[in-house]
């Protein structure tokens, strides 16, 4: 944590700057007055992506279960505790419909791109648990179709009743 006092002020300024930088696939800077392209605007909030990926890989949960947990974790930013130094403007909340929509996009992209993992050369497994490497624990056919996961996701209502 930057506010823990582990680093000097100059280092803290650099770390805050890095954390505050928008992540973008664009290598060309935006023109003056334009916003840089936001990866999160295209693929969804990283906090939801990470939450979904963790529960899918680590626990093998169905999408409907992940959405249920996501909704309980992210429905109200004012509830629960946040890490020390976590800025108020970075405390997000998402309604059920948004969570379901971002999960749908995640499933389509994640499952539809498994073929990219099978092109890696053979090599050693370095880390246990949660690896997406073809030599790791994750095993999914490179020609997998997301239909079963998307069908499960459709069992989730768009709004909470």
Regions found by a protein language model. Give the residues of each.
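ATP/NTP-dependent adenylation/nucleotidyl-transfer catalytic domains that generate, transfer
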Residues: 1-161
């Amino acid at each position: 944590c930057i506010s823990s006092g582990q680093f000097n002020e100059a280092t803290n300024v650099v770390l805050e700057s890095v954390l505050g930088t928008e992540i973008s696939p664009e290598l060309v800077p935006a023109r003056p007055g334009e916003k840089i392209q936001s990866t999160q605007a295209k693929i969804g909030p990283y906090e939801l992506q990470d939450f979904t990926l963790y529960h899918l890989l680590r626990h093998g949960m169905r999408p409907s279960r992940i959405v249920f947990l996501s909704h309980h974790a992210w429905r109200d930013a004012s509830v629960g505790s946040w890490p020390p130094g976590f800025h108020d403007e970075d405390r997000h909340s998402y309604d059920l419909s948004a969570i379901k929509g971002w999960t749908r996009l995640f499933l389509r992209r994640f499952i539809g791109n498994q073929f990219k993992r099978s092109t890696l050369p053979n090599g050693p497994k370095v880390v246990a648990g949660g690896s997406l490497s073809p030599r790791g624990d994750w095993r999914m056919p490179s020609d997998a179709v997301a239909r079963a996961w998307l069908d499960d996701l459709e069992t989730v209502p768009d709004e909470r009743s």
